[in-house]
Amino acid sequence: MKGEWGMASYPIYQFYSELCNYEPKIWRRFQVPGNITMAQLGYIIMTMYEMQASHLFDFSVPSRDNFILYLKALNPNQEETNLTTFKNKEIIQYKFQNDDIDILWEPITNKMKSAFFSCSGEKLTMKYDNGDGWEIGLTLENIIMDKELPGRELPRVLGGAGYGIIEDCGGPGGLKQLADVFQKKTGLEYEDCCKWLGRQELDLLSFDSNDMNFRLKKIPRIYRDIYEYGVQPTQRSINLLERKYLKR
């Protein structure tokens, strides 16, 4: 991220995010510099939720609802009926490419500020892997100016709970099934899941903020190279992705 070469001279965006359609909640609260692209925001989210950059992703921004929220923040006394006459398109999608002429979209490599994040409460959704149907709901909590904060500290996670996703497990329903199987730790289904994942333990309640902040300074760059330049990870990067550093 460019912001690491100096102080955080750009606004800092603080988001609350949550894996949709899954209980117990898997969530993250995090901060990013305001000069990143929507794609970079995606790489940060993918890192935090254990997504392995093996599927396409996009963002949906409810621009009409967010703009109404912004107008309310500017003028809390403005009548609701006047706000709802706003005629902008309801949803803007940020994607790498688009084959559907009926949707309003922008390149996902556009700067994040193009999504018109202006006040607390604005929302967006990240979708990953259309087959499994993972969705991460995000809410902008705050826009901060902290010129004393070294840019190298961003992005950073402030808090969270839960492990994240397991690739190609069938979405939230499959993740819940995996959680149940590994909790029982017995039977043929458990043995099959162990072989498939290559592990005998799976704690979907675990979250290590220190480890995640370490990964957030490194992995988003690897994902950027994969999606934007078609560069496959080196063995060193693969070792990082697989947390081989924890086994030393």
Pin down the residues of each PLM region.
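Short linear regulatory motifs enriched in tryptophan with gly/pro/ser
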Residues: M1-R248
